[in-house]
C-alpha cells in the first residue's frame, strides 16, 4: 500500500523551478569544500512529529487523519506507520531518520509487552532500512510521556521508575546498535523540578549521573561505537531542567567525570528558550569539546514555548554552519528535523512542503557559510584581535611564568598603560551579510 502515491519523488530542479514539490537549492551531489551537500548535511527526518503527532494541542484534539493512526491492532498500525515513514524518507531522498522507542512500537501494558513489541518492530525497521537504504542517525527512549514519569525518570523519587527507565534505555540502545545507529540521544524532558519545596537537588543530580554512568557502561559492554548525546533544554515540560544549556551540561559532565563519554545534541528552539542564539550554543559546544549533532527547527519569537517549526532563516543557519564547517563538520551527527507542520496543515503534501523548504534553507545556509570559511576574514580578524597573547609576554602569563604578585610588579615596573582597540563589530557583520547576500 502506498500512503503518498500522488506525490512524486522529490528531485533537484534548480532555483528557476516553480514546482513546490522539488528542491530549488538542495542538489545532494553538488560539491562544496570537498564534500557533497548530502555528505555535509546528513539530513534526518524524525518519527515523532512527522508520523506520531496527531495534530493536538493543549486546547484541542488532533486534526490529522492518518491511516496508521486509526483504531486497530497496535502492532499492525506500527507496521503501517513504518511503511509510511520509509515511503516518505525515500521520496524525500533523505539518508537518515530518528526515533523514540515508543514512536515505533506500542508500549503495551507492562515491561514484557513493551520489550516484545519493540523487538518485533526493530526487526521490521531493519527490513525497511535494508530495502530502502535509509539509515538510523540516532535512537532514543521516551522517558517523559507516560504518567509514571511525571516526576522524572532517572531523577524520580521512586527507584522502580528508575528501573523501568533503565529497561527502556537498555533496549533502545541495543536497538540503535543493532540498526546501525550512529548516535544515541538522552533527553531529560522531566529530569528537573516543578517546585523546590519537594525537591532534593543534590540527590536528583546524583541519581541522574548514576543513570548516565550505567548507560556509558552498557554502551561499551555491547560494543556500540556511536556517540552518546544529551539534548539540552532549559524548561518545558518541567519548570527547570538539569540539562539547561550546553554550558550547564558540560559542567554536569565534568562534575561526574563523564566529559569524555557524552556530547550534546543541540536543538535550535531549545537554545532560544534558554536565552541564547543557536549560534551561541553551537560555538560553545565546540569551545567545550562536546559538539555532537543538531536538531534543526525554530521557535516563534513571540511565543515563550517550544513550537518546533521548520527552520526558514538562512541568516541564522549560516552562522551555525560557519561554526560547524570551520571545526571540520559533522562526524557521527547530522541535521535532524525535530520540526512539525502546523496544526492546520492537514494535507499529506504539507509534510513534504515543510521538509522540502527546510532542506533548501539548509543548503543555502551551508553554501553561504562555505563562502565565509573559504576566505575566512572573520577568523583572520579574530586572530589579529588576540595576537598579543601569542607573543612571548602573553604565552608566559598562560604557561604559569608569572604569579599574581610578579605580574603586578612587572606591570608597575613597565608602566603598563594599555589603549583600547576597536572590536570592529560592524565590519564583521558586514562581512557576514556580504557572504549571505552577494550575487554569485
Swiss-Prot record:
It catalyses: alpha-D-xylose = alpha-D-xylulofuranose. The active site is at 100, 103. Its cofactor is Mg(2+). Keywords: Carbohydrate metabolism, Cytoplasm, Isomerase, Magnesium, Metal-binding, Xylose metabolism. InterPro entries: Xyl_isomerase-like_sf, Xylose_isom_bac, Xylose_isomerase. GO terms for molecular function: magnesium ion binding; xylose isomerase activity. Its EC number is 5.3.1.5. Its main location: cytoplasm. Binds 2 magnesium ions per subunit. Mg(2+) 2 binds at residues 267, 270, 306, 308. It comes from the Bacteria. Mg(2+) 1 binds at residues 231, 267, 295, 338. GO terms for biological process: D-xylose metabolic process. GO terms for cellular component: cytoplasm. It is found in: Cytoplasm. The keyword Cytoplasm applies. PANTHER family: PTHR48408, XYLOSE ISOMERASE. Belongs to the xylose isomerase family. Homotetramer. This is Xylose isomerase. It comes from Burkholderia vietnamiensis (strain G4 / LMG 22486). The lineage of its organism: Bacteria, Pseudomonadati, Pseudomonadota, Betaproteobacteria, Burkholderiales. The gene is xylA.
